[in-house]
């Protein structure tokens, strides 16, 4: 429902809570109903979400929040973004043409505001939709911000690649991280097999020329992400840092 990231916020926290079952008092952690999850691709890239979380949750609850972050190759993510959200304009039916136009807009924005694109500049001199779409794949900057808000130990970082390759290990790591038994969380077959990850993928791969251009753009950012996570011993990577697959992204 994207409550913390959209105008749904104006409807108040009671509207948000109506979407979740009440948590009965005294129920054990491994009982039939022990927790609920708010999952959305919007929260990580929206700085205001962290502020709103602090506004909603009482101070005694904040230390108990846990964040599971699922990353994706930013080239594949942007391809899916184009397929879902680009409904008009240059390149609406041609991803390579859209990429060329988009990267030109990115260069123009960087000339005006410097190389960093996240958080997206809010000055009216950059195309907000284009910049936000591209900047959503700059994960290191986003994670650095969130780690300052809630500390690295409260984050488990995994990826779509990791889930496809080692679903069982990822599910075990997630269940241990949030403090429930693996049986309560469910098996990979019950939750969604690795093959089910295909539902979030665009039919067909990005054209080679578009993939190469985006790979060159994201290459230093992916390498920065890998180095950043290497320096975060308290953050949890599942199944491990190498298993996230960032190395293959950084190859461009």
Region spans (language model):
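PAPS-dependent sulfotransferase catalytic domain
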Residues: 49-51, 64-69, 76-173, 177-178, ...
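PAPS-dependent sulfotransferase catalytic core
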Residues: 1-43, 61-65, 75-113
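Generic structural signal for well-ordered alpha-helices
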Residues: 13-20, 50, 54, 143-144, ...
């Amino acid at each position: 429902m994207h409550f913390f990231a959209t105008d749904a916020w104006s409807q108040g926290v009671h509207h948000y809570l109506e979407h979740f079952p009440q948590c009965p008092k005294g129920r054990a952690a491994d009982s039939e109903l022990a927790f609920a999850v708010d999952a959305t691709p919007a929260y990580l890239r929206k700085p205001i979400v962290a502020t709103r979380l602090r506004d909603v949750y009482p101070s005694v609850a904040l230390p108990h929040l846990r964040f599971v972050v699922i990353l994706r190759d930013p080239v594949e993510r942007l391809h899916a973004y184009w397929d879902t959200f680009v409904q008009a304009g240059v390149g609406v039916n041609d991803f390579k043409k859209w990429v060329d136009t988009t990267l030109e807009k990115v260069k123009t924005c960087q000339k005006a505001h410097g190389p960093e694109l996240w958080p997206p500049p809010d000055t009216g001199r950059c195309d907000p939709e284009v910049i936000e779409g591209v900047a959503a794949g700059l994960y290191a900057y986003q994670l650095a911000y969130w780690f300052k808000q809630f500390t690295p130990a409260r984050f488990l970082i995994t990826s779509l690649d990791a889930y496809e390759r080692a679903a069982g290990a990822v599910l075990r790591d997630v269940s241990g991280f949030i403090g429930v038994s693996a049986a309560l969380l469910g098996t990979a077959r019950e939750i969604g097999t690795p093959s089910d990850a295909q539902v979030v993928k665009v039919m067909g791969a990005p054209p080679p020329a578009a993939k190469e251009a985006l790979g060159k753009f994201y290459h230093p950012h992916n390498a920065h992400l890998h180095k950043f996570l290497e320096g975060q011993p308290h953050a949890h990577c599942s199944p491990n840092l190498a298993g996230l697959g960032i190395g293959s992204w950084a190859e461009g």
